Amino acid sequence: MPRSLTENPRWYQTAVFYEVFIRGFFDSNGDGIGDLRGLIDKLDYLEWLGVDCLWLLPFYSSPMRDGGYDIGNYEEVDAAYGAREDLIKLVDEAHARGIRIIADLVMNHTSDQHIWFQESRSSGDNPKADWYIWRDDDSGWPEARIIFTDVEQSNWAWDSERQQYYWHRFYSHQPDLNYDNPEVVEAMLSIVKLWLDTGLDGFRLDAVPYLYQRDGTSGENLPETHAFLRRLRSEIDARYPGRVLLAEANQWPTDLVDYFGSSDECHMCFHFPLMPRMFMAVRREQRLPITEILAQTPELPDGCQWGLFLRNHDELTLEMVSDEDRDFMYAEYGADPRMKRHLGISRRLAPLVENSRPLAELLHAMLFSLPGSPVLYYGDELMMGDNVYLGDRDAVRTPMQWTPDRNGGFSRADFAQLYLPPLMDPVYGYQAVNVEAEYRDQGSFLHWVQKMLSVRRRHEVFGLGSIEILAVDNPSVLAFIRSYYPESSLAVKDSENFAGNLEGDDASQISTSLDFREDSKEGEERCVLCIFNLSRFAQPASLDLARFKERQVTELLGRVPFPDIQEGDYRITLGPHGFYWFSIT
Ligand code: BGC
């Protein structure tokens, strides 16, 4: 039965997102570059997989020196991807399958080829002279860190035409816009509307923390930036209800939650600090990195949601970890210098876990059950590999592998014409790893992901429930309870942070805040116990579930009844990297 769009304006709280690099997804016209029509051709696949919302990487006209994050014209679709009509068709076709679409929006900077910058650099007194940030010397805002430390030496770059320095937080070919100029603010708001009018369901807001600069600050998370986001949100709420803003703010949890405002800024934020800690936890075979960061994560304001992810189109960023943990991550996951990019590791999920299926399943099971909406990266559902010999972050942006045919079924162009070579190595190459083969094989990772998503879809507790970390005697075992009370929109109870009443550096107590309302709908499960073995070896665990005495425990994937909870400890054995999702009824 075809799915239809839910009318719930808070759809994003229970959605599964899928990140698409249009350039690498499917080439419909044989020019070697993926395009919007190609993506339309593959919507049936995405519907089958069970995702609810696509996140499109920037599709705007661009010189493509930073994967399209260097926008040359905000008002046009890049000719290689198609035209505005193709985007409208894509949105309509996706909606007809119950899938929403959000687009990346790069507000912080443009390409130096953008006509605004060309005009701005032409003199000190043209109408766009102050649309960017110009100075006579490069000494301003020394407290602002350099983000691409491996390629840029300064946040200032000299422009020989204007004979001045301009400010940039990323590549020097990406000058920052000047948001202190009200004309820039208005121009950006009209671009937002221009694209929302195509029917898009919202935006992933690229690099939002850096919109403003102020003397004596790091130029991140400034009050002016939050004021701008409130303005943006109010304009969207007024004219485009049900659309979502998802912030890319690579920040510590306490700064991150500010991007939700009082439910009046972004609806969602990526949980950047959690991501590397999931990789750390499985390599250390200890739950501590995860429980520690959950304990530091403040409660979500009403109507908000985390975006959770394992991998994306960028490097596995290590900005939000200590120096010691960064060294550990480089040693464990990025030993070859070619794998290091910017402040992180440019590798895909499967090679990171050495192609271990149980480990890939474990990480995804955590991704699908921790509080937030999971965001998958194209190809990871196949356990696609990477190519560390490619420059910048292209290692993880190779063509999607559809079939074992020429070019992996991605394009009919000559191999030499492809935007990047598809993987052809014996382990991850398209002849071994592709959609066609995995679709036929019921035991494939692709089918496993599809089944997990269909189970997740049946239990809104994963999107809407509160979390409490349970005390477990075995440090290699992570266990938590997600619970949801259907009559209240978000069942976060009595707890200051979303890890319930965690204390110190680990889970030590079980909250007594869980109870069941008598008026909850009959038969609807409200409580899911999730247990994960982070170790390579089988592990026993003993959980204190006394307050659930006499309740029934049912394994969710197979609906298999497990022993009821008796007095005191509930004992479980988990296989290597094993996990369980249990409903407690
Ligand atoms: C995007 C990157 C991009 C950068 C500059 C980011 O945060 O995810 O891919 O290079 O912004 O636009």
Residue ranges of model-derived segments:
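Active-site and adjacent substrate-binding regions of carbohydrate-active enzymes
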Residues: 1-492, 498, 502-585
